[in-house]
Amino acid sequence: MRKMKKLAALILTASMAAAALAGCGGKAADTSATTSTTSAPETTAEAAKAETTKEAAETKGLKVALLLSGAANDMGWCQTAYDGLKVLESDYGCEISYTENLTPDDIEAAFADYAANGYDVVIGHGYEFGDPAVEVAEQYPDTKFIVTEGEVSAENVASYVTKCEEGGYIMGMLAAGLSKSNKVGFVGPIQGASLVKIMNGFEDGAKAVNPNIEVQTAWTGSFTDTALGKEAAQAMIDNGVDVIGHCANESGTGAINAAKEAGVFATGDSYDQNALAPQTVVSSSVYHIPNVIETAFQSVENGTFEGGIYNLGMREDAVSIAPYHDLDAEIPQELKDEIERTISAITEGQFTVPLDTKVR
């Protein structure tokens, strides 16, 4: 199961870990919600089948739904969860459904609708799904509710928090090490604690490489407005910034576009975003939400599900950085070595990225 054995084992040994602050998910998109349902293909339990096929047969009939605040194909935060949902369909034979572009006012009803229609597991992707999940969970005790980046728990509600600040820290190191102007910038969407911790991680990482680096920041107020992201990044570029970071979903795509047009580097978030601008996006902070979702689902499948709050980072294979792709030669070897040493220190428990959720 790829990295799942390691991830699951670490979660079990750290069961009921201390609650983290709110996560990396965003607020709702401006478009109307849409729902899509897919039935998994038929499977058989023949002895010669591979392990994943056997598991798919054993869990055939489990229904899993996913709630998203943005588009499932955003090449960012929402798509990480959608990819995880597709793993449950392909590897476990689950019947899946998802609703995207949910507004805050629609979340509770969406949870209730899936639970009332017999879904075994309903996943809310982002901290904003936490309170609605708890509200609905009491009415549907036989349904398991999973919230990524949540800070809530109940008997049938579990939150899985990604240590996004770790990825932000490494992206900050990379940005500072590449900057020639001694100025880097970071574009965020809203001042939620889960997003502030990424921005602050970026700043801390940058200053770990260069204590004198200037870190310019901006909040667009939107996860989905690419124009606002581009405008914020362009203002920084006009002010001398030559590396742009972000944690702003589609708004962050606008920031990458500004960097591309200006001929400066950018770092991606949530997903390997190099494909958006191969000569611009030098690396990305990648959140392995498919791993997290699979681990959470396995606890339902094998009967070990417990309500609680679980914290997952690089050490648990929940966070990593994307390859440097064709820009590898642009990065000084000394910087690459320093980044690798830092990642090793994090994964070996020798260094903890500071968790700071206060706006600076």
Q: Predicted regions span which residues?
A:
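Bacterial Sec-dependent N-terminal signal peptides
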Residues: M1-I11
